[in-house]
Amino acid sequence: MSSKEVVSVKLAELVSVIKPEKIPSAMVSVTKNITLDTIGCALAAAKSSYTESLLRTSQQGGSGNIPIWGFQDGADIYSAALINGTNAHGEDFDSSFEGCPVHSGVVITPAILSLGHMTNASGKDIMRALSIGHEVMCRLGQITGTTVHQRGFHPTSVLGTLASTMACSALLHLRPKEMVNAIGIAASMCSGIIEYLSDGSSTKRLHAGWAAQSGIRASLLAQAGFTGPEKSIDGDHGVFFAFSNGTNQNYEILTEDFGHKWISINTAIKAYPSGTMTHPFIDCCLQASKEINLNEVDKIICDVGEGTVHRLWEPLKLKQNPPNEYAAKFSTPFCMALALHHKKLNLNSFSELYLSDKEIIRTANKIKYKINPNDPYPKEYIAKIFVQLSSGQIKEYSKHCLKGGRHEPLSKPEIIAKFQDNLSYSSLKLSNANKLIDQIYNLEELRNINQLNLSLR
């Protein structure tokens, strides 16, 4: 890509020529895994208080027939995408790209399934749009690295808005010029501050759904003739200027070999329902729990990457004593303490009961960190902990990769088992769930995506 080329124009040209049959089988398999996992994560949140809030507000805006996953009643297209995306991201159990901290599944899947229902899209077109959306979002994330977080914003929301717009534009078969307008419109919808880290409030959950519905809205506006700025990504007042570290970026990452090389193949299916970078430390603690007596632990020191500190470690006293269950998911010390005491970590681990458990809190307050300047985050997700016992002995535990990631992926049976476990938190019939699994893994064979959507009720 030359310095004179406009990023959105080049990207639109590349997206517009991608054919479903040219997407490699490995990417197709990953997209199917992400789709099933995303829906399962949304079903796990179906009976939550935040879902009730979302349903109540959508009913105030009128009715619709776009499916809300796990419920009989539907909603308008924007509310359905908002609810499904928010629910899917709600317990932080959703897939995450290994290489930068973005969650494409919970943005792209609800956007495309909602828009696909409205347009009666085929399974092939759905697969194409999903794959494009995942790829755009992961490539955008690789450009920004950790800078969006450092500026105080949530990359899943900011970058997801752009990616869902490209995915929806692909599903609508917009012309390149219309895609450029759609991206320009979407750029004004990018948002999502990370102040939720201070008190565990629900807004992080909302970010995925907001990005999903924004992509639908921006692409439909462009289709109807609305315009947006051409240099919305790389302009002097564009997205990267506003949300990252300026316009001097390597935009080649976004466009080089696009449609030929699919980096989103490295999307990880989460093994634990907590912030992604807590996972290697959880695995260290699961190892340690087999060997140590917690009553003999004086302190635990963790080697960490600097880019994770402001989200998962600081303020340390708050992270050691999280104010609610949601805040606990983004506390490495508390997640580690849960793993040490329970010898496992699942959705049931994050409850008021354990949040007030004195022994778990005592252990969490023994856990501290030191920055390792050689930690490869965000390129690799690793962990090393040093457990100092009252005898003076120090035991070391390490994890060299992310469970569920490219070096240790979950198998298809494991992904299905995770989906089935998440299903137990919803009211979806088992017969519908089994049909859904079959439909997702044969997605490109569906003549109409509404066949799949009917199984979601």
Regions found by a protein language model. Name each.
Residues 39, 108-115, 130-140, 161-172, ...:
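Buried hydrophobic packing segments
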Residues 87-147:
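Hydrophobic alpha-helical hairpins/lids featuring a short glycine-rich hinge
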